[in-house]
UniProtKB/Swiss-Prot annotation:
Cellular component terms per the entry's GO annotation: plasma membrane
Location (main, coarse): membrane
Family the UniProt entry places it in: Belongs to the UPF0154 family.
Cellular localization per UniProt: Cell membrane
Protein known as: UPF0154 protein LJ_1506
Sorted UniProt keywords: Cell membrane, Membrane, Transmembrane, Transmembrane helix
InterPro entries given in the database record: UPF0154
Pfam families (alphabetical): UPF0154
Length: 73
């Protein structure tokens, strides 16, 4: 096999691996954060309590829905 062709194929394989790895990692992280959001309802309730608000279930659901809506954009 020609040396130039071998080098070309190695470079192409590396580029394909880079692109595939990037998109694979991106999809994994999106799924991870969708399944395990960085903030939970308990954290939001504690934050509301610290701000002097009474954390009702309705308020918690509104905040969680807003966060989920922002993640989908």
């Amino acid at each position: 096999m020609n040396l130039g062709l071998a080098i070309f194929l190695i470079i192409i394989a590396l580029l394909i691996g880079l692109v595939g790895g990037f998109y694979g990692a991106r999809a994994y992280m999106k799924k991870y954060f969708q399944d395990n959001p960085p903030i939970s309802e308990d954290m939001i309730a504690a934050m509301m309590a610290q701000m002097g608000q009474k954390p009702s279930a309705k308020k918690l659901n509104q905040v969680m829905n807003m966060m989920k809506h922002q993640q989908q954009k």
